[in-house]
């Protein structure tokens, strides 16, 4: 199972496989017609409240990841669908966050690998 995370601002590559935008909000500066993606999946993104708490630094990344995983547990079927895709082809999770080490796509990728 190959699941990778990639900033939405980086160019699409042949080996990206199935590309899923996993941000609730459309990325700034990207035209919808210009982005190469297979689906925009808002169902598996962090809630607005959780996203705002993390971005305003009211909670640290570990607390964010813990709460996000609790939210993801409510989206088990959607997670299984994406994990099944990843079993047959590469799955690329697209995100806009600047931090490439501490963001929701990393947490999501880990969760999907466990399904």
Q: Where would I find each of the regions flagged by the language model?
A:
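Residues lining hydrophobic/aromatic ligand-binding pockets adjacent to catalytic sites
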Residues: 1-115
């Amino acid at each position: 199972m190959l699941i990778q995370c990639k900033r939405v601002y980086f160019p699409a590559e042949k080996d990206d496989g199935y590309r899923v935008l996993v941000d609730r909000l459309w990325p700034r500066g990207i035209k919808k017609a210009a982005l190469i993606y297979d689906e925009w999946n808002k169902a598996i993104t962090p809630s607005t409240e959780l996203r705002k708490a993390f971005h305003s630094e009211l909670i640290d990344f570990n607390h964010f990841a813990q709460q996000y995983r609790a939210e993801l547990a409510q989206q088990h079927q959607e997670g299984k669908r994406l994990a099944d895709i990843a079993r047959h082809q590469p799955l690329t999770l697209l995100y806009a966050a600047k931090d490439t080490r501490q963001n929701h796509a990393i947490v999501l990728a880990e969760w999907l690998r466990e399904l």
